[in-house]
Amino acid sequence: IPGSRINSFYFFVLSLFVIGCGLTCLETSANPYATVLGHPDKAESRINLSQSLNGIGWIVGPLVGGQLLFSGVNIAIPYALVGIFVLAVALVLSRINLPDPRRAHEADTNEMVEEKPMRVMAFGLGMLTLFLYVAAQTGVNSFFINYAEESIHIEKQTASLYLAFGGMGLFFIGRLAGGVIMNYIQPRLVLLVCAILTFVATLIVVVCSGTLSLIAFFALYLGESIMFPTIFSLALRDAGTKTKLASSLLIMTIVGGAVAPVIMGYIADTTGSMAIAFLIPLVCYGVIGGYALLKPSASL
């Protein structure tokens, strides 16, 4: 809200940085908490479900934000509404007697656990892959509307609807379906198929335009859906018993989301083509496919 009054780009960047810090703290605390709220054997199922519900926010966010930001409404209103909603949720949670997750950890410490070393090279490759995924996803999300306006020739408000119901809707459905499919098929193979899908879809986005590119974007979001939790879990398998340290390091890879948009924006400004900028996500998906292909089945 102060940023809308000051009307400074750098103040808006600072505001977004503060929001990002809050979201990072929420992500790092909510995911471990979800693992201890219930039977330990169902921990992975709970995390997948909680991450799948992110898709609902990704649908509502672009829908509401696009309609407000591109309709001439004061830019402070969307952020004020989000702030009020978050404060309301925080107030509700503060009144709920939530179980203490430390009790579960205390119970675990009474059992002897065999120390297993971290496979540093394999885990490092997993970190790099997750870094590139976050970079690709953020780049695609950041420039979808710009690309749609330039190459698909649709208005920004219409593009925001396509992003909300088409892209994010398929992302949500894909993550739910992927959680079920992985009960029958190795996660590595599911990741490989999705990497191939996203690579081909991004290639179409680069070389084509119009309706075909829009369809490719939808396929791209569908393929992206299972990547983050799958890469995260595969990388953790190389962490041995250093899962807490490994989880913290993996969370740090979200900084990739700050890298790709800058590079893609520079390419678009330099070449005058938003489509060429999507070569960056194309390379990222290629590396993800290589990671899934070369990942030893024995480590799954």
Language-model region placement:
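Hydrophobic core of transmembrane alpha-helices in multi-pass small-molecule transporters
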Residues: 9-26, 212-227
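Cytoplasmic helix-loop-helix junction between adjacent transmembrane helices
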Residues: 15-52
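Intracellular juxtamembrane helix-capping segments at the cytosolic ends
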Residues: 25-39, 225-240
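Helix-loop-helix hairpin linking two adjacent transmembrane segments in secondary transporters
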Residues: 46-101
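Extracytoplasmic gate region of multi-pass secondary transporters
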Residues: 119-165, 169
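Helix-to-loop junctions at the C-terminal end of transmembrane segments
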Residues: 174-186, 268
